[in-house]
């Protein structure tokens, strides 16, 4: 009863001799405790099945093949092409090395596929692929282990396998595998569903992949981790499937945890954990947050929580928040290890687990001798345990070299907020830093869908030579506040976004507030925000009371509506492109009381496709702009922008420029000066740009203060019905930095 003691072997050298044992229509045979070995250089099949067989059992055997990463079927250990093998059982055996698949079975009988196939309790190591079955109905694949660094394509691959298949209790841990479990045209029926349950899948790309036309597949209690794609993928034609009590995690920063081809793929989906390092855990006709997916009527009790798997090979969750979050499924009473499931609060995933601890609430000290010795350990507990009340982390003086990513914190709300702040209310005393050397590590703090968090009185520092982002926002966030902080970057004149201090490309950040902070050095923009949400742009963005020094450009916002940018100072001789740049920012924006003094800037305030409405106008008011190129630049299709009481001084370009498609704007009480001897103070694309323009001062060293359909004197411009009370007087600004007029005439 020892497979090692009997070695049945062949060294095949041709396709006709490529077997150790060939069963052609053989019935009722058992092969037990035997080692089958075929190490031919190009041919390595061991058992070959052909014809119609019944009740072949292969038990407690070993299969040793040729070490290869070939995808040729010549290396398959158990090969059955045209094998209508009813009652075939392959169990308790080991498969080592080989190519293409360890087991490849294709009955080629689509009209009356054989039944009773059972593959159970086997171990597959470095066999390129695991198991392939085609045209076998009501198969059972249970308790197998598929592992190894030389596995490449499929763990389990079933095609046209109909009926009540059972795929249960399998471990697929192979870091190179493209697919864990792959199904194609596997069709069960109502009342006779297939089951995919209690499987542990840890692979490279896809965990569970339902390709075309798979019906009535019940996916319960699976634990999945993938590194580079979707934990669950469903495709065209699949329907009436069920997804309950699964943990689906991808480490990808660009993919959802689950891809639903449409909302008909699953008829019942709930009590799942969809977690991704990307901003959106679900894809269904576009990227979706869990809340957006729930609006379709699915997953009302599901979550998006990092399970904090203990290792890639065992996938035991260590998240306190995730404990006891499943729901009872009557037909599945045990986990993959045979432990009884809780009858009231079972766990999601392949195994029952218990995590001791409690949710955080109250105040904690971070630093030497505190409750947490580092910021990263505090953030880890936030993620693992969640919160049950307001939480404040008081950080002791010191330098903390902690690059940390934080996702959604369970329990956070408008009442239960999270605050990280220096203990002595002094930003200089707490330096939170990183020296990034790649795009993937380019942050000090990354907030991925994090809500209701305040960062106060902290210095964020990232001085990587090519990467210098400090706070990175991704996903859908609500009520993030950054207050009284300092941002120190790399001295550079690069326009690369790798140097942006606050970077949010794809950050759908409602209620984001950045205030009373200082930004020093950097490239591209100090603050770069693009929600990428054109249909329902976030609101409540406030950037106020900040100082930007030599940050190449100041503030960029795209697809943020009704924003406020107030009381900021943008200055320095290393500012080159934009002070403020707003694109597709609609509604009643307020751009007010900002000082932009940077002698090399191309644009002070730049607007593109910013569209307000009558009765809810945007305001650009009380701004001081002293730059090189253009002061206020109203580019394409900007509506209802009220431009009041601004002082502008430019050296080369236009103090005011308007372009195609803009209309219904108002221009009043502005001083618009250019020092250029060849440029006008104001360039009017047409007379519709401003429906009302008056009480302005247009002054230039050039002969004509206005351009509209050619160069115009003020009187010629007034003939079009605009600016009857405006003037063209040198304001005699006291200095380029303060722009206080000294002209008695202008008073």
Question: Language-model segments: what does each one mean?
Answer:
Residues 293, 337, 358-395, 399-405, ...:
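Acidic Gly/Asp/Thr-rich repetitive segments characteristic of extracellular carbohydrate-active
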Residues 287-306, 316-358, 711-732, 736-747:
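Surface beta-loop-beta hairpin patches that serve as ligand-binding interfaces in beta-rich domains
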Residues 3, 16, 23-26, 31, ...:
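Parallel beta-helix/beta-solenoid
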Residues 1-42, 65-70, 75, 303-307, ...:
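Right-handed parallel beta-helix/beta-spiral solenoid domain characteristic of secreted/periplasmic
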Residues 2-3, 251-253, 274-280, 326-329, ...:
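Acidic glycine-/aspartate-rich tracts in secreted/extracellular proteins
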Residues 10-22, 40-50, 69-82, 97-114, ...:
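Extracellular beta-strand/beta-solenoid scaffold signature
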């Amino acid at each position: 009863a020892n497979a090692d003691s009997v070695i049945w072997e062949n060294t095949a050298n041709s396709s006709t001799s490529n077997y150790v044992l060939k069963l052609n229509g053989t019935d009722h045979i058992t092969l037990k405790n035997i080692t089958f070995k075929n190490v031919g250089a190009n041919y390595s099949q061991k058992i070959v099945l052909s014809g119609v067989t019944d009740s072949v059992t292969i038990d407690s055997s070993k299969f040793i093949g040729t070490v290869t990463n070939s995808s040729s079927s010549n290396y398959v250990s158990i090969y059955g092409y045209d094998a209508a093998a009813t009652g075939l059982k392959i169990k308790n055996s080991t498969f080592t090395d080989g190519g293409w698949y360890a087991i490849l079975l294709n009955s080629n009988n689509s009209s009356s596929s054989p039944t009773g196939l059972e593959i159970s309790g086997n171990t597959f190591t470095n066999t390129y692929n695991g198991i392939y079955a085609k045209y076998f109905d009501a198969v059972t694949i249970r308790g197998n282990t598929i592992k190894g660094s030389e596995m490449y394509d499929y763990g389990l691959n079933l095609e046209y396998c109909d009926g009540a298949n059972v795929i249960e209790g399998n471990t697929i841990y192979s870091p190179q595998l493209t697919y864990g479990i792959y199904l194609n045209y596997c069709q069960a029926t109502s009342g006779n569903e297939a089951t995919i349950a209690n499987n542990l899948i840890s692979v490279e790309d896809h965990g569970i992949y339902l390709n075309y036309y798979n019906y009535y597949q019940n996916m319960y209690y699976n634990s999945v981790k993938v590194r580079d794609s979707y934990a669950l993928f469903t495709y065209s034609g699949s329907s009436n499937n069920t997804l309950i009590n699964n943990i689906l995690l991808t480490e990808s920063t660009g993919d959802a945890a689950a891809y639903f081809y449409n909302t008909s793929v699953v008829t019942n989906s709930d009590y799942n954990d969809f977690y991704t390092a990307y901003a959106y855990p679900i894809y269904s006709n576009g990227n979706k947050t869990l809340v957006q997916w729930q609006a379709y009527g699915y997953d009302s009790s599901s979550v998006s929580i990092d399970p904090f798997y203990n290792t890639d090979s065992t996938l035991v969750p260590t998240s306190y928040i995730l404990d006891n979050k499943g729901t009872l499924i009557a037909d599945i009473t045990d986990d993959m290890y045979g432990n009884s499931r809780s009858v009231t609060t079972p766990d999601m995933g392949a195994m029952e687990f218990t995590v001791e601890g409690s949710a955080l609430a109250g105040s904690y000290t971070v630093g030497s001798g505190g409750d947490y010795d580092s910021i990263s350990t505090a953030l880890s507990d936030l993620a693992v345990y969640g919160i049950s009340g307001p939480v404040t982390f008081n950080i002791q003086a010191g330098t903390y070299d902690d690059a940390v990513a934080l996702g959604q914190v369970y329990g956070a709300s408008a009442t239960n907020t999270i605050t990280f702040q220096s203990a002595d209310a002094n930003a200089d005393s707490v330096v939170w830093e990183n020296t990034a050397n790649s795009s993937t590590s380019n942050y000090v703090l990354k907030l991925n869908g994090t809500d209701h968090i305040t960062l106060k009185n902290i210095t964020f520092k990232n001085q990587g030579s090519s990467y210098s982002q400090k706070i990175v926002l991704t996903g859908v966030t609500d009520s993030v506040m950054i207050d009284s902080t300092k941002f120190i970057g790399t001295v550079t004149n690069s326009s690369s976004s790798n140097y942006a201090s606050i970077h949010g490309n794809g950050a759908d950040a409602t209620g984001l507030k950045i205030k009373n902070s200082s930004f020093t050095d950097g490239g591209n923009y100090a603050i770069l925000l693009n929600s990428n949400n054109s249909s329902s742009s976030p609101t409540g963005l406030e950037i106020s009371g900040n100082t930007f020094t030599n940050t190449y450009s100041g503030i960029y916002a795209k697809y943020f509506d009704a924003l406020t940018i107030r009381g900021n100072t943008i200055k320095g001789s290393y500012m080159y492109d934009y002070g403020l740049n707003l694109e597709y920012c609609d509604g009643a924006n307020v751009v007010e009381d900002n000082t932009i003094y940077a002698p090399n800037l191309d644009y002070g305030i730049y607007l593109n496709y910013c569209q307000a409405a009558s009765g809810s106008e945007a305001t650009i008011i009380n701004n001081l702009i002293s730059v090189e190129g253009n002061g206020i630049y109203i580019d394409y299709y900007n509506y209802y922008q009220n431009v009041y009481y601004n002082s502008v001084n430019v050296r080369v370009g236009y103090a005011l420029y308007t372009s195609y498609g803009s209309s219904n704007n108002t221009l009043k009480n502005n001083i618009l000066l250019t020092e250029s001897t060849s440029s006008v103070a104001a360039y009017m694309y047409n007379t519709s740009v401003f429906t009302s323009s008056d009480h302005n001062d247009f002054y230039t060293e050039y002969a004509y203060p206005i351009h509209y359909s050619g160069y115009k004197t003020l009187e010629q411009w007034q003939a079009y019905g605009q600016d009857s009370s405006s003037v063209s007087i040198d304001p005699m600004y006291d200095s380029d930095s303060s722009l206080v007029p000294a002209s008695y005439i202008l008073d």
